[in-house]
Amino acid sequence: MEYLYEKLTAYGNSDYYAFHMPGHKRNMELMRARLPYNIDITEIDGFDDLHHAEGLLRELQENAAKVFHAEETHYLVNGSTVGLLSAVMGCTERGGRILMARNCHKSVYNAVYMNELRPVYIYPEFSEETDLNGEIHVDQIKKLLKEYEDIQAVVIVSPTYEGVVSDIEAIAEIVHGYKIPLIVDEAHGAHFGFHSYFPQNANTRGADVVIHSLHKTLPSLTQTALLHINGRYADRERIRNYLHMLQSSSPSYILMASIDECVRAMDECREEIMDTYVECLQQARERLKQLRNIKLIEAEHYDRSKIVLSVKNLKNTDGEVLNGKRFQEMLRSYHLEMEMASGSYVIAMTGPGDTQEGMDRLVQAVMEIDKNILCEELSGKDEDHTIKNISYEMIPLEQAYSSFEAGRMEGESVKWNEASGRISLEYVYLYPPGIPMIVPGERITSTIVQKMVKYKEMGFSIEGLSQENCLLVAGNPE
């Protein structure tokens, strides 16, 4: 079988001269940066066209489908974002209704806006003990599908940013009873199915459309992803059409070569790669379970590649109440950069590229920090500074208008403390993970404003706002 990276390398070393894009012309002496100009080409003879794949790229995508246990697979060079946009818009009619998990990524909300959809939200259960939003239960979906008979598709996130996994097989069975597709955002689970230590790939559990971000948990360059289609309920032709419209018309051959090499590694070397990784990960997790105060969070249905460490209700020996942001800063002093900090925890994202040395550094740093922590009941004064009441729980808000309707309304900017009761005309995200706290068209509550204020005070990044410390709301108070 021919592989893209090898073919690009051979072409780059040949005497073919480029009278075509890109403008660097593979001239390695032109620029000081040692970037891979030599293999950066456009759609020339012999290298196929991603938007009309008939040769090499068609064969490679078919091989990716085989490796990831899908019926049909597409390379994505615009990340999972373009896959989610294409899947949602391809599986729904304009103005239709969609059932979606409230913790979906913002790209799903953008698809809802672009297709003028009417969303029905499924709110994941929230754990007071861990401050994690949990799985989506099949009973929730069953109830809402029965209540809203015009739902055209269901979208859920599994695993979540924190690694929580839902029962895809049971959910798919219910959804298919209504002859509609189940779209699974498995962006954080591209490694699923390649080792028994991790959950199964959603392609094997009945999902109709699955999106994998290769770059998140497998050895591939940033922005690389896959979209898989299975079964008979997803409209394949419409999904393909949206991919052609929304994905770059100049797909990077460097990124596609990265996808090819990643798929090839998972096909030919998965046991060697994954066994080494899992052994290293298991050892780290076992050592972290011995912590006295900091807690390694685990759940019943969980992706163990995510190391979630909680400092909930903890103080250091100086009496400082800890939170996820402060814990992240402490780890940064050890030159360890976490994936994300939330109210009471941090996430250390692991993958096959991790080394024993890297894992040892993490464990040693956390153990040292743990020695300088007190585990005691926080006083009322302490609770003014803790995140107990501002954990990232999905708070239901009234949908006064659709996001599309809100996007066409006249608005005004008001201070946060003046926004309660008004209709928001913009998104409010805590980033990461990029899940909206407020969606355009929703009525703002004092509770959500309080959460925003406290997160801001603690140094978290609140995004989506057109003006700092203000919210764009509908012009006429209701």
Regions found by a protein language model. Name each.
Residues 74-76, 154-157, 346-351:
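Short glycine-rich or small-residue beta-strand-to-loop segments that form or flank ligand, phosphate
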